[in-house]
């Protein structure tokens, strides 16, 4: 493939969001392509994100193919009311021009008009294919996260039962679903819960209704809220916190389609950090846990509690679970695999 000049409508103006740097920018830098955000410049191809103005004339330029990088399940909204409100808010904020309509309809129509659509899980792919058969599943690159070979026999960790949660605050409310097993766990183990995330966030469209993360966690975790720490997300803080922890957890609210259809990225990151990880039974987590041969999926409160105790009480089991996860990474989530998938996606759109 020749070196491309790629026009990109990004998720963040700074290009620093994880969805920018771990996806298109990762591939473009590795392959030597140029990415510009001024779409009026001469480009070979345009990549659109969910924050694009889908009705912009810039996407209708002759002989310039458009690739839609759709990493979340916007085709499966929470409710018709929420879907319309999202579309209306994006119109009123100036993000999307044209007529007001539910956001999922904007996404559907843009899938139909794009030369290729990228997504991040096979579950999302099945939802997109009715609107675009040229769909490619590509997970995020995690090269920015260190691959840690952790010792579970470290004497400094013997009396410390620290548990890690990592991610964006938009998914943090899932922790209230396991407040009961965490409370019961705290009565038998001296635990501490570390949340590596943003200290503040906007509840709607990343720009409206600012919330304090620690306040939400203290409310959701009730009587064990004194066991909570919020650590600002940086690569360094994440790696350092992981070194102090014995387990990671990813509880999610499966009643919210956007959460239920999230890909396996966060589980893979926890394995990369050298931690066994317990997860809610989402389609992606269930699929990957089965493929990796780990006992990670927790169907109910009793299972969460039992699995927490097993990992904390049995370092040998925790080590084996982590090694299975890391072996899965070595076989299924390498830099060369990801780059090849990006190559094929662009080649399919440039034909």
Where does each model-flagged region fall?
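Donor nucleotide-sugar binding/catalytic pocket of nucleotide-sugar-dependent glycosyltransferases
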Residues: 112-150, 158
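A charged, aromatic-enriched C-terminal amphipathic alpha-helix characteristic of glycosyltransferases
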Residues: 22, 303, 313-347
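Nucleotide-sugar-dependent
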Residues: 170-173, 232-272, 278-287
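Conserved catalytic-core segment of nucleotide-activated headgroup transferases in glycan assembly
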Residues: 7-27, 140-151, 155-241
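Active-site proximal beta-strand in glycosyltransferases
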Residues: 61-91
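Membrane-proximal helix-turn-helix segments that form the acceptor-binding/catalytic region
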Residues: 76, 89-117
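Conserved acidic donor-binding segment of nucleotide-sugar-dependent glycosyltransferases
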Residues: 291-302, 310-316
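N-terminal pre-catalytic "stem/leader" segment of glycosyltransferase-like enzymes
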Residues: 1-54
């Amino acid at each position: 493939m020749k070196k491309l000049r790629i026009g990109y409508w990004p998720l963040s103006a700074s290009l620093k969001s994880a969805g920018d740097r771990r996806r298109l920018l990762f591939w473009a830098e590795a392959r030597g392509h140029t990415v510009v955000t001024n779409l009026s410049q001469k480009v070979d191809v345009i990549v659109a994100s969910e924050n694009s103005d889908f009705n912009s004339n810039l996407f209708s330029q002759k002989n310039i193919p458009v690739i839609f990088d759709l990493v979340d399940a916007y085709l499966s909204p929470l409710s018709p009311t929420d879907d319309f409100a999202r579309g209306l808010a994006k119109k009123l904020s100036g993000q999307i021009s044209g007529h007001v309509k539910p956001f999922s309809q904007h996404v559907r129509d843009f899938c139909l008009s794009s030369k290729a659509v990228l997504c991040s899980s096979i579950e999302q792919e099945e939802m997109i294919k009715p609107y675009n058969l040229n769909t490619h599943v590509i997970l995020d690159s995690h090269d920015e996260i260190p691959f840690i070979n952790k010792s579970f026999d470290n004497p400094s960790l013997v009396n410390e039962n620290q548990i890690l949660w990592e991610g964006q605050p938009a998914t943090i409310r899932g922790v209230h679903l396991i407040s009961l097993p965490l409370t019961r766990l705290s009565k038998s183990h001296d635990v501490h819960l570390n949340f590596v995330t943003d200290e503040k966030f906007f509840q709607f469209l990343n720009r409206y209704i600012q919330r304090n993360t620690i306040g939400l966690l203290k409310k959701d975790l009730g009587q064990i809220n004194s066991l909570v720490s919020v650590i600002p997300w940086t690569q360094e803080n994440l790696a350092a916190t992981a070194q102090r922890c014995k387990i990671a957890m990813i509880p999610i609210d499966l009643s919210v389609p956007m959460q239920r259809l999230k890909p396996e990225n966060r589980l893979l990151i926890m394995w990369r950090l050298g931690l066994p990880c317990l997860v809610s039974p989402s389609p992606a987590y269930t699929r990957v846990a089965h493929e990796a041969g780990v006992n990670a999926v927790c169907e109910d409160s009793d299972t969460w509690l039992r699995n927490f105790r097993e990992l904390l009480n049995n370092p040998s089991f925790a080590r084996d679970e982590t090694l299975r996860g890391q072996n899965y990474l070595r076989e299924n989530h390498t830099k060369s695999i990801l780059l090849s998938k990006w190559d094929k996606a662009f080649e399919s759109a440039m034909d």
